[in-house]
Structure formats: C-alpha cells, structure tokens
Amino acid sequence: MEFHDDKKNELQKKEEIITEAIDTLFQSSAFGNLINGFQNLINSSLKDVQTTIHVRERDTGLYIDITIPATFRDGEIVVDVKSRYLHVTLQEKQKHQNEATFTSMTRTVQLPYEVRQEDMETSWNEQTMTLFFPKNKHE
C-alpha cells in the first residue's frame, strides 16, 4: 500500500511540474503575450459599456436606477416590462464615411412584484435613468 501511495505522490509531483512548465512557456512566449493583450483589449472595451441596475423598494413604490454608459448616451434606450421582468436594451449606431457600426446590449432583471409599463415614470440624473412604478397602481 505504501508503494502505491509513493507512486501516486510521485506522479502528482510530475504532473505539477509539467503544468507549471506549460504555464511558464505560454506566459513568457509570444502566444502568451498575444492572449494577455487580447484579454486586456476585451476588458478595456467592455468597461465602457457596462451598465448597472439597482432595484429599490419603498413605501411609495418601486425605483429602478439604471446607469447608462457614456457610449450609449446618444443611442436608443428601450425599456420593456413584462409581468415581473424588466428588459433594458441599449442600442447605438455610428456611421463613419462608408462604414457603420451597431452596438447593442440587453439586461433583464426580475422585479420583486408585478408592475405595469403604462404606470412607469422616468427621470434622469447625469448618467442614471430612474424608473418609478407607484405602489398604488400595481396592487
């Protein structure tokens, strides 16, 4: 039994050495630099389009704060309410000479209770759009 455990430990150590060697090879190679550069590009690109949605329940009703990224400020904002689900879609079209780009992002959140879109009130404060659903209109 002891012989079998020694072999198992020896194999685990060899596997760790091989894994570390492969990681070192890829991290220090041109391929590793390419992967890291691509990951940094994706992360920095997504930072500009991230949005947050905060739901606050108060005695007067339901408040939903939606942070709109600066990249979408001139675009289209579509809010759709279905029962207990809020769907927010941000869209922006940009035209440069002979080419056009279209960026779109959708977020969906489940609300604490059912609301009706026709009761929705909206307001703006800098980069935050606030939706309000009065309590007396959904009960």
UniProtKB/Swiss-Prot annotation:
The keyword Signal applies. Coiled coil: none annotated. CDD domains: ACD_sHsps_p23-like (cd00298). InterPro entries: A-crystallin/Hsp20_dom, HSP20-like_chaperone. It comes from the Bacteria. Residues 44-139 form the sHSP domain. The keyword Signal applies. Keywords: Signal. Residues 1-32 form the signal peptide. Belongs to the small heat shock protein (HSP20) family. This is Uncharacterized protein YpqA. It comes from Bacillus subtilis (strain 168). The lineage of its organism: Bacteria, Bacillati, Bacillota, Bacilli, Bacillales.
